Structures are given as structure tokens and as C-alpha cells.
Amino acid sequence: MLGGRTNHWGRISLRFGPKDFKSKDYDGLGENWPISYDDIKPYYNKLDKLIGVFGTKENIFNEPDGFFLPPPKPRLHELFYIKGARKSGVTVIPSRLSILTKRINNTRGVCFYCGQCDRSCSAYADFSSSSCYVIPSLKGGMVDLYTNSMVVEVKTDNNGKAT
């Protein structure tokens, strides 16, 4: 299937926070990563801009903010959840999903809330590798696509470039 798992991942676009990279320092369990959140933050920022992620800046320590498009307005049932959660003292924030609520380029459309995200988006408002990388690459004429195939080896030259 063109796009593979990026067709089925639900578009959930959360960042690991500082604690996730250094969990041993916080709870004594597992091992710390050899990198920190600050090391990877520039790549998260680049990815947010590339794929388009909606959300809101919340300043929650281990749920880092990113570059967000505006989230959709809450639906009626979500307003009930929010009201109940706030009454109970539970923090509620909008999802952080890679679905375009605002145009970021000329190849992908904007979500019109049809509710068919699980079946692939006809407006290309959701991120998938096929709609955002493969199809545009094919239009450039420098890529060959082999379906029903599996890569077992990528050969590289002395500079590490695929040959």
C-alpha cells in the first residue's frame, strides 16, 4: 500500500518532552537517552512546519509546544467533556494532529471536517508519506516508484549518498 503505516497512524503528532529523554534522572527507571529534548527540538520544529500540526501553546513542562496551526473548534460532545474535566480540575487541551486547518502549501488542501480521516483524506489535509512526499517527488520526474516491493539493502557511495 502506497504510504504504508502513515495511512493508519491517526495523525497524532506529540513531542517527547525533557523527562522522556532523561527518565532515569526523574524516576530512576531505565536509561537516559544520549541526547536531550533540546538536541532534537530544532528537528521537531522543522517537522511541525513541514507536515502541518494543529494545536495550542499550553506551556506544560513535559508536553512541549511546537509550531501550531489553529485547532478546530470543539464539537458539542467535546464541550461537555471539557466542562466536566475543568469542573474536576483536569487539564484539557486540543489534540495535536497533523491535519491542515490552514493552507501551508499549494499541494495540500485544508480540512473541511467531513470526518473521514480514517479512510484517507480527499483534500490531502492529513499527513501521509504518499500524499506529502511520494506523489510530489514523482511529479519531479527523478523518482521511480516500485509498488508491491520491499527494500532489503540501500547501496551508498563514498559520500553516503544512495546510488
Cite the ranges covered by each PLM segment.
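Conserved beta-strand-loop-beta-strand element in the redox core of flavoprotein oxidoreductases
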Residues: 150-163
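Conserved redox-cofactor binding core of oxidoreductases
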Residues: 12, 24-148
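Conserved phosphate/anionic-ligand binding catalytic regions in large, soluble enzymes, centered on
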Residues: 1-11
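Flexible loop/turn segments at secondary-structure boundaries
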Residues: 16, 100-103, 152-155
